[in-house]
């Protein structure tokens, strides 16, 4: 997808913009920027951590790209080596990986933007709706992996997000697309 590098920069700017408007409740931000519409919600542990759903008209608004970000105040000298790597995470206890898309300096630390992938929008929103309905949470924890110690890079490696309003928020974002 040739729109992703440009979008990553826009996401980065957007996440930094949202920092002053962070809420711990389930307040969704739904907007459009050029050819991409999005729905973003703040985390409950750190409100500056965001969960984002991006929809591009290049895909005829049929796919959603899911991202999340973590703010860290750890400042290891080699943090940039994480860029484009797949780091181990747990999503509600299930182990998988997430790709580091961007590492941005922020205040006294860094904002790390991850991707969970791109999915068919209708099926994925239904999957998340059902998943959240059973689990009653959407929790991501960054965990240790081969040659990766989470404590070196993340002071708070866990967050969760409320998704009660996921479906209507994605519907609104899709209409903007």
Identify what each model region corresponds to.
Residues 1-24:
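Classical Sec-dependent N-terminal signal peptides that target proteins to the secretory pathway
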Residues 23-177:
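A generic "folded-domain core" signal
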């Amino acid at each position: 997808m040739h729109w992703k590098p440009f979008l990553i920069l826009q996401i980065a700017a957007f996440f930094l913009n949202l920092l002053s408007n962070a809420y711990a409740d389930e307040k969704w931000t739904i907007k459009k920027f050029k050819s991409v519409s999005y729905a973003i919600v703040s985390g409950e542990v750190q409100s500056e951590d965001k969960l984002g759903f991006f929809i591009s008209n290049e895909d005829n608004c049929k796919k959603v790209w899911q991202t999340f970000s973590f703010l860290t105040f750890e400042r290891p000298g080699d943090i940039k080596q994480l860029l484009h790597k797949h780091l181990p995470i747990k999503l509600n206890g299930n182990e998988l990986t997430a790709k580091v898309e961007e590492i941005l300096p922020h205040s006294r630390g860094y904002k790390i933007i991850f991707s969970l992938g791109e999915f068919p929008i209708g099926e994925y929103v239904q999957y998340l709706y059902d998943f959240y309905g059973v689990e009653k949470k959407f929790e991501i924890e960054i965990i240790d992996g081969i040659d990766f110690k989470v404590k070196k890079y993340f002071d708070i490696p866990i967050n969760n997000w409320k998704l009660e309003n996921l479906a209507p928020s994605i519907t609104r974002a899709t209409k903007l697309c």
